[in-house]
Design a protein with these regions (language model features):
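Extreme N-terminal segment that seeds HTH/winged-HTH DNA-binding domains in transcriptional regulators
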Residues: 1-33, 39, 89-119
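Short hydrophobic/aromatic-rich motifs at helix boundaries and adjacent loops
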Residues: 8-9, 26-27, 42, 69-72, ...
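Short, cationic-aromatic polyanion-contact patches
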Residues: 12, 16, 36, 72-87
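Beta-hairpin "wing" of winged helix-turn-helix
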Residues: 27-28, 32, 60-69, 73-76
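N-terminal helix-turn-helix
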Residues: 33-65
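Hydrophobic alpha-helical segments, especially transmembrane helices
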Residues: 54, 67-69, 88, 110
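The DNA-recognition helices of helix-turn-helix-type DNA-binding domains
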Residues: 58, 119-120
C-alpha cells in the first residue's frame, strides 16, 4: 500500500481508495488481514482517527470487516464489489461526459470508435 496525499481529496477518502486499489491489484486478498490503523498512522504520520474514518467507509460498504481483537480483513467478494463500483463510476464520470461532449461537437458513434481504436 502506497499513499501520496493530495490536497483536493480528504485524507480518509484517499486511505479508503488506496486500500480499494490494493484489493483490486490483489495486494490485499480476500480474507487476508490489512495493515492496522496504528501501522498506517505511524507509517504516514497521520492521525489514527483519520485512518479509522477511512476504514469505516470500507466497513460500511462491506469491503472490509473487523475481527474483534485481531484486526481488519478483506471481505469475501470485495474485489468483485469494487470492480462493479469502479465500472459504474467510470461510466458516469467518463463515458457519459464523453458522449455529451461528442454530441455537442456532432461526433458520431463511429468516429468515437475510430478514435478509441486509434489509441488502443
Amino acid at each position: 500500500m502506497k499513499l501520496e496525499f493530495t490536497n483536493d481529496v480528504p485524507i480518509y477518502i484517499q486511505i479508503a481508495q488506496s486500500i480499494e486499489d490494493s484489493i483490486l491489484k490483489e495486494i490485499f486478498k480476500e480474507n487476508e488481514m490489512i495493515p492496522s490503523t496504528t501501522e498506517i498512522s505511524v507509517k504516514y504520520k497521520i492521525n489514527p482517527a483519520t485512518v479509522a474514518k477511512g476504514f469505516n467507509l470500507l466497513v460500511d460498504e462491506g469491503v472490509i470487516y473487523k475481527k474483534r481483537g485481531i484486526g481488519m480483513f478483506v471481505s469475501e467478494g470485495s474485489k468483485d464489489l469494487l470492480m462493479n463500483k469502479r465500472k459504474e463510476r467510470f461510466f458516469k464520470d467518463y463515458i457519459i461526459a464523453l458522449l455529451e461532449e461528442a454530441k455537442k461537437l456532432n461526433i458520431s458513434k463511429e468516429d468515437i470508435i475510430k478514435m478509441l481504436e486509434r489509441e488502443v
